[in-house]
């Protein structure tokens, strides 16, 4: 598959890049994408939920009423789960929700996601660019020139550039990441993947 390289003004540079078939025309594995996205979402969970059981609730040393003669069932503590203010039976406990996915499956998932995006025509290649200073307006103008201002866009850089990242931070539908760090979830969650030309080579080296 060949794509024309655009400049930040939205015009063609006259250059054409050929996408690596091993990455952008791979066999799509829905199951690999499912496993990877599931692990990403699971690993985001804090798992800090907790309810106190009868041994952890404050108080409860006193017997609520005498053993016999009240007509009620016998009770030994005011913090029994049967009483108001008592502990919780089988309540939530802190746990780790993390899921492990093999590196090969993660790579397959990312290749599948990029292939899906390429088949949809959702990959745009732009020449490398940097800004002199942090300017959200400048980044918004680039997206408008490329016709991506109304689309949820994942922009891939060859390496971290703080000015570019911070220029795009306040644009609601834009996410800027280093090409190596783009996850399967990031790719699938976007409508368009905007790739800087040098970043394209890094992706192909990593996943090819």
From Swiss-Prot:
One of its GO terms (cellular component) is ribonucleoprotein complex. One of its GO terms (molecular function) is rRNA binding. The keyword Coiled coil does not apply. GO terms for biological process: translation. Belongs to the universal ribosomal protein uL4 family. One of the primary rRNA binding proteins, this protein initially binds near the 5'-end of the 23S rRNA. It is important during the early stages of 50S assembly. It makes multiple contacts with different domains of the 23S rRNA in the assembled 50S subunit and ribosome. Forms part of the polypeptide exit tunnel. This is Large ribosomal subunit protein uL4. The lineage of its organism: Bacteria, Pseudomonadati, Chlorobiota, Chlorobiia, Chlorobiales.
